[in-house]
Amino acid sequence: MSLTPYSPQPAFKSTLHEKRVYEAMPGKLPDLHNRFSNHTMGLFEKHGIENVAYWTEDVGTSNRLVYMLGYPDLAARENGWSGFQSDPDWQKARAASEENGALVRVSKHSILRLTEYSPR
């Protein structure tokens, strides 16, 4: 995988992470990248969600965006997502980016906690 141009350099500041994988609709990956780089990342930060890193796959043909978010704990995750999803700026950005149809076909996510021996 390669970091996207808008990704921060990965650094694990938090102990709780979320790996999210989005399968974009055919031809919509550039629009998804645009929404993340111009709207989503800033809104995540506004709501206390740490942007760890964003990747695309190097091998094969893929419409996949893989990214990692960080939180101090599960309660912070719930509060961050609740605030993000109800934010009028997010709702406006999402609606505008999906004027011509949905950008994401399938999304998956996993909550991960660093092990004691993991480098930080």
Describe the residue ranges of each PLM region:
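Acidic/histidine-enriched, glycine/proline-rich intrinsically disordered or flexible terminal extensions
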Residues: 113-120
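Short glycine-/aliphatic-rich beta-strand segments at the starts of folded cytosolic domains
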Residues: 18-22
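Short hydrophobic/aromatic beta-strand micro-patches
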Residues: 23, 68-70
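Short, surface-exposed ligand-recognition loops at beta-strand->loop->(often short) alpha-helix junctions
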Residues: 24-33
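An amphipathic, aromatic/His-enriched active-site/gating alpha helix that lines ligand/cofactor pockets
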Residues: 3-12, 34-52, 71-111
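Trp/Gly-enriched beta-strand/coil motifs that build multi-repeat beta-propeller-like domains
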Residues: 55-56
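Short acidic/glycine-enriched loop/turn segments that link adjacent beta-strands
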Residues: 60-63
